[in-house]
């Protein structure tokens, strides 16, 4: 009977440890489940990102997608002004690179680029006006995407624009997730 008593004691001990761990909030949490926005933030300003690349309309596309993503993520107003806001997201587009990564042979024996990678690097700062320390900052936030050019050379600009649009959306999602992960 001593074996049964030992098993009951061990089972009781294991149950007590599990119950204690569950009720004490062991400190584990799911990645990507940050608390979202600081409750004191009701209005966020996102001025037009500065563009050091010269890529036409890139600043407008990136800024617009960041605003849309912030609106999707919380119960805050988002405006393009820095007046009368509780927090500001400022960005500077540092680099925009299109690099051929896939090639195909033409009918004349020539090789042409058929797939491109786009890499975007942006300096971003998320802060409350008047505070010295930002709530979140990244001096080289990068995102990379690829797009196929297709076989029709006439569609190059359409495909390139679609690639930039897709990159802007994915970049904004990734950026806002990283910013809110800190909370």
Question: What is the meaning of each model-derived region?
Answer:
Residues 2, 24-75, 79-83, 98, ...:
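A structural "domain/chain start" motif
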Residues 73-77, 83-136, 144-157, 162:
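Surface-exposed short loop/turn segments
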Residues 12-23:
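Bacterial N-terminal signal peptides
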């Amino acid at each position: 009977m001593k074996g049964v008593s030992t098993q009951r004691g061990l089972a009781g001990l294991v149950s007590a440890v599990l119950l204690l761990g569950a009720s004490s909030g062991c400190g584990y949490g799911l990645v990507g489940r940050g608390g979202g926005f600081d409750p004191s933030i009701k209005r966020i300003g996102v001025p037009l990102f500065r563009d050091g690349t010269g890529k036409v309309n890139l600043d407008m596309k990136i800024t617009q997608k960041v605003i849309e993503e912030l609106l999707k993520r919380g119960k805050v107003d988002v405006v393009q002004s820095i007046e009368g806001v509780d927090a500001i997201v400022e960005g500077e587009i540092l680099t925009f690179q299109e690099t051929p990564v896939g090639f195909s042979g033409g009918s004349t024996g020539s090789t042409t680029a058929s797939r491109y990678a786009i890499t975007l690097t942006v300096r971003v700062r998320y802060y409350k006006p008047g505070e010295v320390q930002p709530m979140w900052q990244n001096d080289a936030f990068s995102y990379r995407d690829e797009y196929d050019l297709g076989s029709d050379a006439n569609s190059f600009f359409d495909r390139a624009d679609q690639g930039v649009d897709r990159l802007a959306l994915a970049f904004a999602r990734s950026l806002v997730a990283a910013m809110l992960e800190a909370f």
